[in-house]
Amino acid sequence: MKRTWIKNARIVNEGKIFHGSIVIENEVIAEVLAEETVPSQPCGEIIDAKGYYLMPGVIDDHVHFRDPGLTHKADIHTESTAAAAGGVTSFMDMPNTTPQTTTLEALNAKFADAATKSIVNYSFYFGATNTNADVLPTLDKSRVCGVKLFMGASTGNMLVDRMEVLRKVFANAGMLIAAHCEEQSIISANTTAFKEKYGEDPDIKYHPQIRSAEACVYSSSLAIRLAKENNARLHILHISTAQELDLFEDNPLSEKKITAEACVSHLYFYDKDYETLKGRIKCNPSIKTSEDRNALRKALSTNLIDVIGTDHAPHLLKEKEGGALKAVSGMPMIQFSLVAIMELVREGILSIEQLVQKMCHAPAELYHIERRGYIRPGYQADLVLVNPDHEWTVTADCVLSKCGWTPMEGQKFHTRVEKTFVNGDLVYSDNKVDQSHRGQELRFKR
């Protein structure tokens, strides 16, 4: 039996911070101990946490690892490597790959592939289309994290835009629907208008006017209406506007069937950043005004935003060249998501307890993940140790994503991920990832 004692830690868990230690026995947390308490049995390995923060591993509910079919820019192994280095111990991957994850065959192939490649734990969304709503009730609810619904066209073009199909998806899903909400008719009209005025590829600064706040608010409002009509479980992804916040309830997660995610990119950048970062920060929905960013940040200290995700979506830098219509949408983010939000903690925008709630606890609760997301005896030992006082600057040579770049390059951070544990194994330490480790399928109790 393998027993590891992580001692002298500041444990952040379930709304509290306390000095203590944790005993890992094989894959699971065996004991959570107060400051001076020693383990009930001897431990073969002892790790001194040096007073650093010890928290549950981050669960990222929103990634695009580009595997299969788009592996020139990312794959499950490289991106799970970046995840481990960033303190992310579990991910849920989107269906807009090649082939798209819109059949049971494609879904099962993804799971089989991840079992041989992924360093951290994983699950996959099943993609809704205009033709597969009848398949949704047959999905294995204990294995599939959710149904992804594109109510706006984005990378991979999986748009579901027929009202009768949308109603059927909301009626048939039987599990969480994760929705990308942008009204395509508004985007199309804006695209036509801007092309007429500025040519075939308007400047990147017009991206938030083409994929506008109006498009987001309209689509999110429609999704919420359909969810209420069908008593469906709806999770709206990457909220990007101040107006959308008015659509959600400031209630505890346990009392809601309609929830919201904000992504690091929309919490960190705003439209002025297009001047320097240009297409590097182009994403869908677009990064909008400072007023939108500030409203999203303010909402982090409330229950309006339930989850912080990344929408990690790598592309090669050459694919990010061009203007608002030519540059592709998406950016790598998973390796720096935790330290980025720790900067917001440092600025007083949210507390570290709220960070852990929105990046660790809430994804586990919202998706009904079995035995993860909390530091509790009997739970899987997915943990991250964070140095709260280590200043460093992001450089290109530290990027582990296959695409080889990050919009965070040059950013100064004041905290650092020191160690990451996945299922009791130390997979990241001293700037090195254990490439031989393999994560597990997430399981869902529904």
Summary of predicted features, one role per range:
Residues 50-117:
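Metal-associated gating/positioning segment near the N- to mid-region
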Residues 1-5, 10-56:
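Histidine-rich, glycine-flanked metal-binding segment
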Residues 9, 22, 27, 51, ...:
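Divalent metal-coordination and catalytic microenvironments
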Residues 201-222, 226-231, 301-308, 313-389:
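His/Asp/Glu-enriched, well-ordered alpha-helical/loop segment
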Residues 112-128:
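A glycine-rich helix N-cap at a beta->alpha junction
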Residues 9, 323, 377-443:
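C-terminal cap of metal-dependent C-N hydrolases
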Residues 73-80, 130-139, 222:
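Short, acidic/polar
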Residues 134-308:
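Histidine/acidic residue-rich metal-binding segments in metalloenzymes
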